[in-house]
Amino acid sequence: MPWLKGKGYEKEVCDYLLKNCADENGCVTLDFVVGTHAHSDHIGGFDTVIANPAITVKKAYLKPYSDDCTNLYERKRWDNDVVYGQMKAALEAKSVPIIENFEGEKTTLGNFKITFFNGNRAENARKSGENTSSVVVLLEVHGKRAVLAGDLNYRFGAEKKISAKIGRVDLLKVAHHGYARSCTAAWLKNLSPQIDVICNEKRAVHASVMHRLKKYTGAEIYTTADCNGVKAVFMPDKIEMQIDIM
């Protein structure tokens, strides 16, 4: 994922897609988009991308959001309901089908086999933040496996439950930008990745998370901001990591 800085990052995303993914007519078709959870740094600006006349989205995976299920801190400080409403409205304006419950659902993207975890809205006794509800995506191709962990955290035992279902992988997109309350020992031991990708600067990664990554995986670590973007190329015999792609 590119390191997108501040206001105007929607334009950076659109420009990147149009530069790298457009067909001979200058148009981009996305088989699907995934809204991992209703936080502005994950789905904010999605409405601008969806509304772009040169970009077509075939379907969207987006769980329902309600302030009724969200803790007071997030309701007062963040704009979860706003960014969710903007994304959903943009999808509806272009008649894009929205899949709201997709726990365990499987699909494909080119040669990739994709499985979704945490794909249904959780009903917890206590109100929680959106990170607890973050969608996790497993990708498989050429015998290689990668997990995109969104912002999943360890509340309610989510990391332990999901990683037990997934098992070992080759690459992990580290959850929650490497901040605290993610990447438990159980999660890392179950997944045992050889490559860790963190969408952040190295200096911003929480010390406890970096310690656990080194202790329990010993993997190569790539921080997207320091690398000016990271691309993982899945080949029959290896995963080739490319940097400086922006």
Descriptions of predicted regions:
Residues 34, 61, 99, 115-117, ...:
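Hydrophobic/aromatic beta-strand patches that form the interior of the parallel beta-sheet core
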Residues 1-29, 92-168, 228-246:
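Core dinuclear metal-dependent hydrolase active-site scaffold
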Residues 60-117:
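Extended active-site neighborhood of metal-dependent phosphoesterases/phosphodiesterases
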Residues 43-55, 69-81, 184-188, 207-211:
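Metal-dependent catalytic neighborhoods of phosphoester/phosphodiester hydrolases
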Residues 160-162, 169-191, 195-243:
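Internal alpha/beta domain cores that form substrate/cofactor-binding pockets in large enzymes
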